[in-house]
């Protein structure tokens, strides 16, 4: 059903709006989820006219449109207001424009606000939306906020208090675009629609879980931002722990947003908080140095533009989380995330316990691999007999990958997540209880790294991280399942 809504984007002149938001809204328009009864108000400091704003929108969607006319018709629903977030008069003008557009498009007073700006402005915007009666209780009112949601628990808590002054928790959608990816959402199907997995998804059968977020790129033009953030804040506090919660949660009573969210929150509340000694042993940080991949030379992190030449910011983080629940108590959830690694890829490996062998040789563990990006799908490794006269065992794989055609047809994560907001589905968004629990744990690791002399390990560009990350798994009698660097070295592609 087509949504009736006035969308207001704060930060409408920014890169995110042009690259992600306008194309995602256009796809929803093409699919009929937005049609006649919607309008978009773009606000930013730049003094744009409506006509110029429309041209920016058209340019951002032209390659998706069936015709220029279709793109222009979509863009005609867009309106622009030059806006200073600190100026009360601008909110009065915004309220008047919203009222006019609500009447023109018969939007039934439904309002969606998207804060595509730096978090320090969130509180100011929320306060003015409430004080100037733009948030007035008529129709639905929903707020989407981008990451990062704070830089630690203290700043995140203050940010949350500011938003709660104008919106209720159920109206706030903290977006994490990874949760919009097709295979992330398919984890529910893999787990809860297949008896062979759900019955063994526990500590009696699973030895360890491995989560890898690997990037081949370095920090590129984001050196200034990244040097103040690092891998732990940038990737672990949100993406990694959100994915962990989907893997570790108990089966919800029903497939509804409230039941799913309740089970996810239990995981966050059950995250084990290690002792200081355990933190030192179980969490690794690293920073890339120069290297050569496929004949291309790459500089070290400290040589990147806008990076402190003596920076101790980590570009790689690895460790072991534990969930103190009946289902997974004692099972390590290993993670690693880093820049300038061998290959881009997000993989989850569920490593099952080894069986006692009657064949006179140890058996390879069964491993369920979930491929999230760049390919999507899953595989299951099994032990089977090799063809031939002798009875020799070898692992083989049941493999399903979504082909390029199907992958291209799947919704963009932002499209899927905006669709969910319009339909009041908060399943794939972070509740404050999840955010607060994750920051409390991440803050402990950050504090240790900042004040206790924990080593910052070097790793060569093109590797899969420092040796310490591999040594960590060995302490648990495990090893990383995905090691693309081995093949690269054998092929002479790494130096």
Regions found by a protein language model. Name each.
Residues 1-145, 149-495:
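Secretory/organelle targeting and membrane-embedding segments
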